[in-house]
Amino acid sequence: MRRISKHSLVLLLLLIGCGKLKELPTAPGGGGGGEPIDPTATLTRVQNEVFTPTCGALGCHDPLGRQENMILTTGRSYANTVGVASNQMPSLKRVTPLDPANSYLYRKITGAGITGDRMPQGGPYLTDGQIKLVRDWIRRGAPND
């Protein structure tokens, strides 16, 4: 009887431990999955702090430049990124919600696993804070706020 109780206790502790693991925030495919997700990482912030000043300007990803047929101006960036296949790597979406490591846009701004140049082309590249903002927005599910 005592032996069954020890086994039951061990099983109970394992089940409790597994339940706590489910509560940790994670992101499939890497891309900062172990770090807390910034709840303020919204499309509005990404637009104002990343897309508008660095991507949708200077004739690159604006309605005139349309590099890679991607427009990153206010009101158009979401439809041109989330769930849209990359022109350079069609097997990847530009933004795959919850999965920065498999989002081509995230790869392009970090320079990891890409075709062509890191973005913004020729630099200056995004700051660590800007990259984290994009990563956290994707990890939050890339909501259209």
Residue ranges and their predicted role:
Residues 1-41, 135-145:
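Post-cleavage N-terminal segment of exported redox proteins
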Residues 23-35, 39, 44-128, 132:
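Solvent-exposed helix-loop boundary motif
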